[in-house]
Amino acid sequence: MEDTKIRLAIYPGTFDPLTNGHISIIHRAKHLFDKIIIAVAQDSGKKPLFSIEERVSMINTTFFSDHMVDVENFSGLLVDYVEKKNAKTILRGLRAVSDFEYEFQTSLMNRKLCPEIETIFLISDYKWLYISSTVVKTVASLGGDVTDFVPENVLICLKTKYCQSKSNLVIT
C-alpha cells in the first residue's frame, strides 16, 4: 500500500515583517514538504511593530495563490501547536553561527518536550545572510531603501507605518 501521508512542516516565527530571506526558505522547503504552515507567533516575548493580524495579512497576501502554503497564528508552546496540527517537523532558517546557537538550544528543548517532533534547519541563501526583520525595520525606520529585502506588499506596510512620522522611505 502506498504511503499517502502528507509531509507537513511548521515554519514558526514572528515575521515582523516577512522578508525575502523568509520567502527563500519557504520556497526551498516546498521541495522537501507537501505543505508548509507559516505559524505566526502571537506571544514571542518580542514587541512587534505590526499586530498579529497585520503580520498574518502580509504573509497571506504574499502567498495568496500558493496551495502549498497556509498561514495561521498561534500562541503558547510551539510543540503543542505542532502536535495539534499533526505535524512532525519544525522548519527553521539559519543565517549565521549565532542563529544556530539559539536554534540548537530551542530544538533540544522542543525534543525534550515532544520527542516525536524533529527540527529541520535550512541555511539561508547567501543573498539573504545579512537580512533579518530587525535590520529591515531599522533601515526602514531611518528612511533607507528596503525594496530589495521585502515583497512589495510588505514594503507598502512598512511605508505606512514609518511614513506617519517620515515621508522619505523609498518605494520603486
From Swiss-Prot:
Site note Transition state stabilizer, residues: 22
Cellular component GO terms held in the UniProt record: cytoplasm
Binding site for substrate: 14, 46, 78, 92
Pathway listed: Cofactor biosynthesis; coenzyme A biosynthesis; CoA from (R)-pantothenate: step 4/5
GO MF annotation, one: ATP binding
EC number(s) given by UniProt: 2.7.7.3
Entry annotated with the keyword Transferase: yes
Positions contributing to ATP binding: 14-15, 22, 93-95, 103, 128-134
Reaction(s) catalysed (UniProt annotation): (R)-4'-phosphopantetheine + ATP + H(+) = 3'-dephospho-CoA + diphosphate
Cofactor needs: Mg(2+)
Biological process terms in GO annotation: coenzyme A biosynthetic process
InterPro entries (UniProt xref): Cyt_trans-like, PPAT, Rossmann-like_a/b/a_fold
Domain of life, source organism: Bacteria
Keyword Magnesium: yes
Family matches, as PANTHER family: PHOSPHOPANTETHEINE ADENYLYLTRANSFERASE (PTHR21342:SF1)
Its job: Reversibly transfers an adenylyl group from ATP to 4'-phosphopantetheine, yielding dephospho-CoA (dPCoA) and pyrophosphate.
Protein name as catalogued: Phosphopantetheine adenylyltransferase
